[in-house]
């Protein structure tokens, strides 16, 4: 086992604070409308330019192991805030730095660290409740656009695009961000249910100009099996041909004789058919087939429940107003499934989302809800260079998370004002003893830090502006972009309550642990083995 280096008390805390400050100082230059960019060197490819706090935090590793421990613990604050609300990482880092710096001063002055932590925790619990009372619901497009604009570093086009996307696909819809091909940002909305599977044979194409299969009012056959024998399908094909409607087959696979016969029938015009593979794999495929069945009012033909393809009738088939299939995707528009059945299915999937343990599973389940309940919108980010594209895409992602958080828990006045008002409201809060009271004061003083940092980044004097804001009340604050005072809501400067709440909770959680640290242990650097030089022997 490697030898360890151990530091105690003040020595440990000073080192830890130095690491915290290096990371926080790098992150906090990005805060606010006049925050600056940070350039990150990559081991391969061009450097990345970012104004996203968590991207900066993730890049920082310090040489001194004790300092690095401090930095890594604050990195955890940024990551947790990012996971919870998707934004507010810089605010969380600034809050953590302020609580740690003030807290360690109190420890050095002889306060009991455990009581300080209890005081900080008490102040944060009260602050979260106060934030909830200040919170205003965010439901109209204008407020959503404002939240998106602020989170995308005052880029109005991004805010408007996100608000438009939410209008089109609803609050539950899936909105994804992709690389665009031009210089302008675009919004693409897919109505209906789309999945990533294309036609199994190009001979199904009936719109050569677009290279797609478009079928009006088709029947939809859903089968949880491979279809290779055409005899199994004859009864269904005959019934569909009599009804004079096209047929879409969605199955595990359609191959061999069955596929060849379907192609021949289509080319001769006997019955219009198109076949695609079912989306997903394994259990997810079964679930997605069931989703399509619910949407189209059909039944999944599955041997697991004793159904055979030969015995399928028109009643077992789903229907939709239109189905469009191209090389890579299939879109089902206006399925005829009952609204009550679709809502029931959505509720069932939401329950699974609550119980999901992995982020990947949760994301896939949310996609399924969106496909059933709303639709899918794609924001295509335009930029002149790849470096700009990456930076802008990260900002759009942040803005998207912020707007979702705003819709979920409402909004409060932005620009650090909400936390200043909360701190003023809690000024009379007391605890069991003097050390805990100091802990409360540490937390309340730290709540001014985001406002001060925004002002500092704008090149103004933080103390003057902070005093002016504290002298006002309600949503009165300082607009760092235009350098004027006024009502933050009227200025359109809003922060999602969830983002502010998460930033405060995670910052206090990690800062409380660091204040109570008394000893730090790390591996001693390994000294390289001495070079033995060349072995003696006969000369050549």
From Swiss-Prot:
ATP binds at residues 30-33, 51, 87-91, 415, 479-481, 495. GO terms for biological process: protein refolding. It holds the Pfam family Cpn60_TCP1. Keywords: ATP-binding, Chaperone, Cytoplasm, Isomerase, Nucleotide-binding. GO terms for cellular component: cytoplasm. Its main location: cytoplasm. CDD domains: GroEL. It catalyses: ATP + H2O + a folded polypeptide = ADP + phosphate + an unfolded polypeptide. InterPro entries: Chaperonin_Cpn60_CS, Cpn60/GroEL, Cpn60/GroEL/TCP-1, GroEL-like_apical_dom_sf, GROEL-like_equatorial_sf, TCP-1-like_intermed_sf. It is an enzyme of class 5 (isomerase). The keyword Chloroplast does not apply. PANTHER family: 60 KDA HEAT SHOCK PROTEIN, MITOCHONDRIAL. Forms a cylinder of 14 subunits composed of two heptameric rings stacked back-to-back. Interacts with the co-chaperonin GroES. This is Chaperonin GroEL. The lineage of its organism: Bacteria, Pseudomonadati, Pseudomonadota, Gammaproteobacteria, Enterobacterales.
């Amino acid at each position: 086992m490697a030898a360890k280096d151990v530091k105690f008390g003040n020595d440990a805390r000073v080192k830890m604070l130095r690491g915290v400050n290096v990371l926080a100082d790098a992150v906090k230059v990005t805060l606010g409308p006049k925050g600056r960019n940070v350039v990150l060197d990559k081991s391969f490819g061009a450097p990345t330019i970012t104004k996203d706090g968590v991207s900066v935090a993730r890049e920082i590793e310090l040489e001194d192991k004790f300092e690095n421990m401090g930095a890594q613990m604050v990195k955890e604050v940024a990551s947790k805030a990012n996971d919870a609300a998707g934004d507010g990482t810089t605010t969380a880092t600034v809050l953590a730095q302020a609580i740690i710096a003030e807290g360690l001063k109190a420890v050095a002055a002889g306060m009991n660290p455990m009581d300080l932590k209890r005081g900080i925790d008490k102040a944060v619990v009260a602050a979260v409740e106060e934030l909830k009372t200040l919170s205003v619901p965010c439901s109209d497009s204008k407020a959503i656009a404002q939240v998106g604009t602020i989170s995308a570093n005052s880029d109005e086009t991004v805010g408007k695009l996100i608000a438009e996307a939410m209008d089109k696909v609803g609050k539950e819809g899936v909105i994804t961000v992709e690389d665009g091909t031009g210089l302008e940002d675009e919004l693409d909305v897919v109505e209906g249910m789309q999945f990533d599977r294309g036609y199994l044979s190009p001979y199904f194409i009936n719109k050569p100009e677009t290279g797609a299969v478009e079928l009006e009012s088709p029947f939809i056959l859903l089968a949880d099996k491979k279809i290779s024998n055409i005899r199994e399908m004859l009864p269904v094909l005959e019934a569909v041909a009599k009804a004079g409607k096209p047929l879409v087959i969605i199955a595990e696979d359609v191959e061999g004789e069955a596929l060849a016969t379907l192609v021949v029938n289509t080319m001769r015009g006997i019955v219009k058919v198109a076949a695609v593979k079912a989306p997903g794999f394994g259990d997810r495929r079964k679930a997605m087939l069931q989703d399509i069945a619910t949407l189209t009012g059909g039944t999944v033909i599955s041997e697991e429940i004793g159904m055979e393809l030969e015995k399928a009738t028109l009643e077992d088939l789903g229907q939709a107003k239109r189905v469009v299939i191209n090389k890579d995707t299939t879109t089902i528009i206006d399925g005829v499934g009952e609204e009550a059945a679709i809502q029931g299915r959505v509720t069932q999937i939401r329950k699974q989302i609550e119980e999901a343990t992995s982020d990947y599973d949760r994301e896939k389940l949310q996609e399924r809800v969106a496909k059933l309940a709303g639709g899918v919108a794609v924001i295509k980010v335009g930029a002149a260079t790849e470096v700009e594209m990456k930076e802008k895409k990260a900002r759009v992602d942040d803005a998207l998370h912020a707007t979702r958080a705003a819709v979920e828990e409402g909004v409060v006045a932005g620009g650090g004002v909400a936390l200043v008002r909360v701190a003023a409201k809690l000024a009379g809060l007391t605890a069991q003893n003097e050390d805990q009271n100091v802990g409360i004061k540490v937390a309340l003083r730290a709540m001014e830090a985001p406002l001060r940092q925004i002002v500092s980044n704008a090149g103004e004097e933080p103390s003057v502006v902070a005093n002016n804001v504290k002298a006002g009340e309600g949503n009165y604050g300082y607009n760092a972009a235009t350098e004027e005072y006024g009502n933050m809501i009227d200025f359109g400067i809003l922060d999602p309550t969830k983002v502010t709440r998460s930033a405060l909770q995670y910052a206090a959680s990690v800062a409380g642990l660091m204040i109570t640290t008394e000893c730090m242990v790390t591996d001693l650097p390994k000294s390289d083995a001495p070079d033995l030089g060349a072995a003696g022997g006969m000369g050549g």
